[in-house]
Amino acid sequence: MNEIDTNTTETKGTGIGRYFAGKTIPQIIFGSAAWACILGYVLFSIGQILMYVILRVIGGAAGFSSDVWNTALIYLTFFGVWIMFFLNALLKKNRPLLKAYGTGLRGNRIPELLIGILVGFLMNGVLILFAIMHGDIHLYFDRFSIGAFLFLFVSVFIQSAAEEIMCRGFIYHRILRTYRGQYLAAALINGIFFGLIHITNNGATPIAIIDIMICGIEYSALVYYFDSVWMAMGMHAGWNFTQSILAGLPNSGNVFPYSIFRLDAATVSSTTWDSASRARSRQSS
């Protein structure tokens, strides 16, 4: 993987020891991995809240109230996250991060993005198929329109990519910038952070949170081995779209107003439902 050039000065030593050499306490605090996580979450939250208010006003003025719109609204609020992180990257010291979001990384290309989407779809699709064949769940067809399908796919992609911009784009590369070349530290820290931001999910359990942390580390491995944040975006979106829009299964413990298939809850025992919710919360927003 090609590490983003942040024009930082090399010092003697290795790893964390090299980072601390010759730095003041404020430089250490505000250049730390913890600060990257805090700043990332603040930007993430502000962007989502502001966009939610804007979309609520627009939707109310236009009289939007359909199931498709109410489902898309939940995902489209994450477009504000895109805006906040791109504005942050316009600051001179953060401009190298634009490479992680755009085409600056070798693997940030359309083929890698499409591969990620396909892999995410197949991974979740196979698990859902096995659950159906085993009799754990039963799905029934509800409705379909090509317009809703495309609109909601774009909406889900915006949400999934927003989380990847924060975790595998901003935080991952800020940690690499802090601890020069410490890829394992970057993967572990942003993976743990990825799990912690889902701790308020409906029905979240310790096992589910640990599972999400592992998933965050897996996404970091994609960024490392394929030099592609876009592939992680695609895989995340493919999984979430398959789960919540195609199959109508809980995402973050929530079932959305619109989905192509629906879960027949009458055929699912409480034990199976809880197990399925935990298993499928790993990629939830």
Region locations from a protein language model:
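Small-polar-interrupted transmembrane alpha-helices in polytopic inner-membrane proteins
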Residues: N124-G125, Y183-I199, M213-G216
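Membrane-interface helix/loop boundary segments of multi-pass membrane proteins
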Residues: A162-I189, A221-S228
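Membrane-embedded alpha-helical segments of multi-pass membrane proteins
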Residues: Y75-G80, F121, I146-F153, A162, ...
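Short, Lys/Arg-rich, polar N-terminal cytosolic tail immediately upstream
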Residues: M1-P26
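Hydrophobic alpha-helical transmembrane segments
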Residues: I158, T267-S285
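Membrane-interface helix caps and helix-loop-helix hairpins in membrane proteins
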Residues: H134-D142, I197-P206
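Functionally important transmembrane alpha-helices
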Residues: V42, I46-L50, A208-S269
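Juxtamembrane helix-loop-helix connectors linking adjacent transmembrane helices
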Residues: I16, M51-A72, P96-A162, Y172-T178
